[in-house]
């Protein structure tokens, strides 16, 4: 790297909160980078300096408290990505190792999909804007893979920044030597390429007696999701569309100078069900002047009440929340099966005898024949079952457990976040 890089917020395909970890080969462990602290880590698209229209992807991490860039790693085709556990992932490029400790399994899954999508685009050679992640049905977690922005910035300040030109993706490095300025600071114009189209102006259609409303012809939406904390703000949408929407979106604005406030007069009847009070002087037939309250949204009536799960951070419907819907939720039946069958013996053996240098090992009962230690692992498990015969009960018990999950009798349930 020969210059400071500050990727444009609009260039991120995924951005989450995590602690950047570094590998210490001497002790064989992972330690927080630069003293630790929560960082905003994302996968962003960057342009090659040759100006040939080709793009690459950069994993960029910036610590929140002091804006220090603690991680910069270019995504390459030979990147080896490992999911050690639901909240800790690490990868290796050119004998350099990087790790992230996420705040939730949902953030970890989102970041994993972002890295895999970047690698697929590099392999296919298609890293244009059409290949960024906008297909919610393909990727899941529909509140993550969209245009991301920093949650600390003012959402009312809309700005357009061109794509930043940085060095070619030839190395990965932890940044240690400088602190970035404020997000809204201007940058020298000679380091940028103007490749974003100007927003298309709206067509103004005025009517004298209608309220102001916006009719959106293109139903595709862009939701801002910047990380773990934004689930509190996810349902909040702006009244007007973002001017930075792509040029394919068409809008028609119906506006007028002043929106009138409607008052409704209802005659008061003693036998009615309004129950809004009586005339202070006791006279009947008084007029009640009120503004009718808005009913619940049509979506809430049709789909039921939706909340975010405290375990997996996914949205769920309270009416459809049954056992087996949340894989990250604690399940007493699954825990009991592992304790009764003494599976901790198998885990201990695999950890000490068949784990990789990172301490990761394959699931004891995995049937993946591509594993180079497939036969050795099963022979060791069979030998261990003679010392702990109760391990033989694990497979039939797990089969019964899966049947119970299919019947919604077992498994974890979503729990609404407070």
From Swiss-Prot:
GO molecular function: protein kinase binding; protein serine/threonine kinase inhibitor activity; stem cell factor receptor binding
Residue spans of biased composition, Polar residues class: 146-156
Gene Ontology biological-process entries: negative regulation of epithelial to mesenchymal transition; negative regulation of ERK1 and ERK2 cascade; negative regulation of intracellular signal transduction; negative regulation of lens fiber cell differentiation; negative regulation of MAPK cascade; negative regulation of transforming growth factor beta receptor signaling pathway; positive regulation of DNA damage response, signal transduction by p53 class mediator
GO CC entries: cytosol; plasma membrane; transport vesicle membrane
Effect of residue 351 to F: No effect on phosphorylation or ubiquitination
SUPFAM superfamilies in alphabetical order: PH domain-like
Domain SPR, first and last residues per copy: 308-416
Pfam families registered for this protein in UniProt: Sprouty (PF05210), WH1 (PF00568)
Modified residues (Phosphoserine): 206
PTM notes: Phosphorylated on serine and threonine residues. Phosphorylated on tyrosine. Phosphorylation of Tyr-228 and Tyr-231 are required for ubiquitination.
PROSITE patterns to which the protein is assigned, alphabetical: KBD, SPR, WH1
CDD domains for this protein: EVH1_SPRED-like
UniProt cross-references to InterPro entries, sorted A to Z: KBD (IPR023337), PH-like_dom_sf (IPR011993), SPRE_EVH1 (IPR041937), Sprouty (IPR007875), WH1/EVH1_dom (IPR000697)
Result after altering residue 266 to F: No effect on phosphorylation or ubiquitination
Residues annotated as domain KBD: 201-257
Region (Disordered): 127-171, 275-302
Location of Phosphotyrosine modifications: 228, 231
Cellular location(s): Cell membrane; Cytoplasmic vesicle, Secretory vesicle membrane; Cytoplasm
Effect seen on changing residue 268 to F: No effect on phosphorylation or ubiquitination
Effect recorded for residue 240 to F: No effect on phosphorylation or ubiquitination
Function: Negatively regulates Ras signaling pathways and downstream activation of MAP kinases. Recruits and translocates NF1 to the cell membrane, thereby enabling NF1-dependent hydrolysis of active GTP-bound Ras to inactive GDP-bound Ras. Inhibits fibroblast growth factor (FGF)-induced retinal lens fiber differentiation, probably by inhibiting FGF-mediated phosphorylation of ERK1/2. Inhibits TGFB-induced epithelial-to-mesenchymal transition in lens epithelial cells.
Assembly notes: Homodimer and heterodimer. Able to interact with SPRED1 to form heterodimers. Interacts with RAS. May interact with ZDHHC13 (via ANK repeats) and ZDHHC17 (via ANK repeats). Interacts with TESK1. Interacts with NF1.
Associated disorder: Noonan syndrome 14: A form of Noonan syndrome, a disease characterized by short stature, facial dysmorphic features such as hypertelorism, a downward eyeslant and low-set posteriorly rotated ears, and a high incidence of congenital heart defects and hypertrophic cardiomyopathy. Other features can include a short neck with webbing or redundancy of skin, deafness, motor delay, variable intellectual deficits, multiple skeletal defects, cryptorchidism, and bleeding diathesis. NS14 inheritance is autosomal recessive.
Protein name: Sprouty-related, EVH1 domain-containing protein 2
Protein species of origin: Homo sapiens
Gene name in the database record: SPRED2
């Amino acid at each position: 790297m020969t210059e400071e890089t500050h990727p444009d917020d609009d260039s991120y395909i995924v951005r989450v909160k995590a602690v950047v970890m570094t590998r210490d080969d001497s002790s064989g462990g992972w330690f927080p980078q630069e003293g630790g602290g929560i960082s905003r880590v994302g996968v962003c698209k960057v342009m090659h300096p040759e100006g040939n229209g080709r793009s690459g992807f950069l994993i960029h991490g910036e610590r929140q408290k002091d804006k220090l860039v603690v991680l910069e790693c270019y995504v390459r085709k030979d990147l080896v990505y490992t999911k050690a556990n639901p909240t800790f992932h690490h990868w290796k490029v050119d004998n350099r190792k990087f790790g992230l400790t996420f705040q939730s399994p949902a953030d970890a899954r989102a970041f994993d999909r972002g890295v895999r999508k970047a690698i697929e685009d590099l392999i296919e050679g298609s890293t244009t804007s059409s290949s960024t992640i906008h297909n919610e049905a393909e990727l899941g977690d529909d509140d993550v893979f969209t245009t991301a922005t920093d949650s600390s910035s003012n959402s009312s300040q809309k700005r357009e920044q061109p794509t930043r030109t940085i060095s070619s993706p030839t190395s990965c490095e932890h940044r240690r030597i400088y602190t970035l300025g404020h997000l809204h600071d201007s940058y020298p114009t000679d380091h940028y390429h103007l490749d974003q189209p100007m927003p298309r102006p709206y067509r103004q259609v005025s009517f004298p007696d209608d309220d102001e409303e916006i009719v959106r012809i293109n139903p595709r939406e862009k939701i801002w999701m910047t990380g773990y904390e934004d689930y509190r703000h996810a349902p909040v949408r702006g009244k007007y569309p973002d001017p930075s929407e792509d040029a394919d979106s068409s809008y028609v604005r119906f506006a007028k100078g002043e929106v009138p406030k409607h008052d409704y007069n209802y005659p008061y009847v003693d036998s009615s069900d309004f129950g809004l009070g009586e005339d202070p002087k006791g006279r009947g037939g008084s007029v009640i002047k009120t503004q009718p309250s808005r009913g619940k949204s049509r979506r809430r009536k049709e789909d039921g009440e939706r909340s975010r799960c405290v375990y997996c951070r996914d949205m769920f419907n309270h009416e459809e929340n049954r056992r087996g819907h949340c894989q990250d939720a604690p399940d007493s039946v699954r825990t009991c099966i592992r304790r009764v069958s003494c599976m901790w013996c198998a885990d201990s053996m695999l950890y000490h005898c068949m784990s990789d240098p990172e301490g990761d090992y394959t699931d004891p009962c995995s049937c993946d024949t591509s594993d180079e230690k497939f036969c050795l692992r099963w022979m060791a498990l069979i030998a261990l079952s003679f010392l702990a015969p109760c391990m033989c009960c694990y497979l039939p018990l797990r089969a019964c457990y899966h049947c119970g999950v299919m019947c919604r009798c077992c498994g974890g349930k979503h729990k609404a976040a407070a």
